Amino acid sequence: MVLWLQLALLALLLPTSLAQGEVRGKGTAQAHNSTRPALQRLSDHLLADYRKSVRPVRDWRKPTTVSIDAIVYAILSVDEKNQVLTTYIWYRQFWTDEFLQWNPEDFDNITKLSIPTDSIWVPDILINEFVDVGKSPNIPYVYVRHQGEVQNYKPLQVVTACSLDIYNFPFDVQNCSLTFTSWLHTIQDINISLWRLPEKVKSDKSVFMNQGEWELLGVLTEFLEFSDRESRGSFAEMKFYVVIRRRPLFYAVTLLLPSIFLMIVDIVGFYLPPDSGERVSFKITLLLGYSVFLIIVSDTLPATAIGTPLISVYFVVCMALLVISLAETILIVRLVHKQDLQQPVPLWLRHLVLERIAGLLCLGEQLTSHRGPATLQATKTDDFSGSTLLPAMGNHCGPLGGPQDLEKTSRGRGSPPPPPREASLAMCGLLQELASIRHFLEKREETREVARDWLRVGSVLDKLLFRVYLLAVLAYSITLVTLWSVWHYA
């Protein structure tokens, strides 16, 4: 009987002991959980059953909207030959993860948590123009807010293909696009939007390093929706147009100014006398110096397989003008240095150059004043050559100055007896020498007069070609300066 009473009492007390043990165990567990940091408890709570391979939406029909933003930090390089632009941007993207939401009151009012990027789902948004992997720092974490908003901030070194137009170099403006799009998901799964207003993105230069060769004019944005050729569906993409302009001061100093100075020196070289040989050697030296200058600056000029900058055409034309100037100088020197082998100036050439062209260039008075002393010198030479002396003495000699005619003349006129034969022969020899001297002086003066005529023709042609050359250089320079000014301030 007593045994039965003990068993009954034990049966009544056992459930009570078990209940107290459970209560004690729960209290111990709660005490143990309360000692863990809230960040750990929140991280374990969010990632306990999380699957990063599944798009984070509860309704699969609902697309995930990714808001993106980009700020240009620096223009690292512009490779015109390979058509590649390297930029450094601050990239930000935001999306809502419906599986990363919590109540801040349950976790010490934590509203924001950093989570490893490898532990959650991340949209596969890439840049279509990527041609190389940049050296971007690895940011292994993202921020998550309690509403489920994920913030992914990371700097990117972007190496992209860009169609660079170098025709206006060094006053060129380039427009390169960065197209952000999902590589796999259609717009029904991932949609893309702009995080900030387009006006703010366009004028944001707050972090741009503005000390380099390129100046950032603005960043334009455009949203597009396109379909692929395989009809997999429509894809959303956001384009950022990076508009940059080259600073031309360095190239103007190193390329344009030396070329301009050499052309000015070539123009000044026309003031050397056309009958001097120094002008030819001067022009050849100048042409050689310009060739060396082009060799030095050839590495500075951009080059592509599809286009040539206008400044290269400018250098080629300047070289051609120097060659034309040298050819003109050689022609003029050839005209004025024919010496005794030259023929008299043809009448048609004399009329065309010394009358028509000289009158057109207002050079008539200069030619008249230049010709006066020559004519006066010729008159003096004629007087000195014995033109008045020989007729007075020529009657005393025959054709060769013989004494026969002199004797006949003396007898016919009743003159005094002739001088001795030796004196007559000496006089005739003297007259013959005077005649030879006169003939030589006349021939030399004729040659000099022909040379002076050719010199006058060469001088007029030299002034004509100089003015034509000067007009060509000025017209070409004004055209290029106008084009470059329009491009620079457009």
Curated annotation (Swiss-Prot):
Where is the protein situated, by its record's location annotation? Postsynaptic cell membrane; Cell membrane
Query: Which residues does the annotated region (Disordered) include?
Result: 401-422
Q: Which GO terms describe its molecular function?
A: extracellular ligand-gated monoatomic ion channel activity; GABA-A receptor activity
Signal sequence span per UniProt? 1-19
| Keyword annotations of the record | Cell membrane, Disulfide bond, Glycoprotein, Ion channel, Ion transport, Ligand-gated ion channel, Membrane, Postsynaptic cell membrane, Receptor, Signal, Synapse, Transmembrane, Transmembrane helix, Transport
The record's Gene Ontology biological-process terms are: monoatomic cation transport
Q: What is its main location?
A: membrane
Q: How does it sit in the membrane?
A: Multi-pass membrane protein
Give the UniProt entry's GO cellular component terms: postsynaptic membrane; synaptic vesicle membrane
* Residue ranges annotated as Cytoplasmic topological domain: 271-285, 334-467
User: Which stretches are Extracellular in the membrane topology?
Assistant: 20-249, 307-312, 489-490
Q: Which cysteines are joined by disulfide bonds?
A: 162-176
Segments for region (HA-stretch) = 426-462
Q: Which reaction does it catalyse?
A: Na(+)(in) = Na(+)(out); K(+)(in) = K(+)(out); Ca(2+)(in) = Ca(2+)(out); Mg(2+)(in) = Mg(2+)(out)
Tissue distribution: Expressed in cortex, intestine and liver. Not expressed in muscle or spleen.
Q: Where are the transmembrane segments?
A: 250-270, 286-306, 313-333, 468-488
Glycosylation, residue list: 33, 109, 175, 191
Q: What is known of its domains?
A: The HA-stretch region of HTR3A seems to be responsible for the low conductance of HTR3A homomers compared to that of HTR3A/HTR3B heteromers.
What does the annotation say about its assembly with partners?
A: Forms homopentameric as well as heteropentameric serotonin-activated cation-selective channel complexes with HTR3B or HTR3C or HTR3D or HTR3E. The homomeric complex is functional but exhibits low conductance with modified voltage dependence, and decreased agonist and antagonist affinity. Heteropentameric complexes display properties which resemble that of neuronal serotonin-activated channels in vivo. Interacts with RIC3.
The record's family statement is: Belongs to the ligand-gated ion channel (TC 1.A.9) family. 5-hydroxytryptamine receptor (TC 1.A.9.2) subfamily. HTR3A sub-subfamily.
Its annotated function is as follows: Forms serotonin (5-hydroxytryptamine/5-HT3)-activated cation-selective channel complexes, which when activated cause fast, depolarizing responses in neurons.
The entry's protein name is: 5-hydroxytryptamine receptor 3A
- This protein's species is Cavia porcellus (Guinea pig)
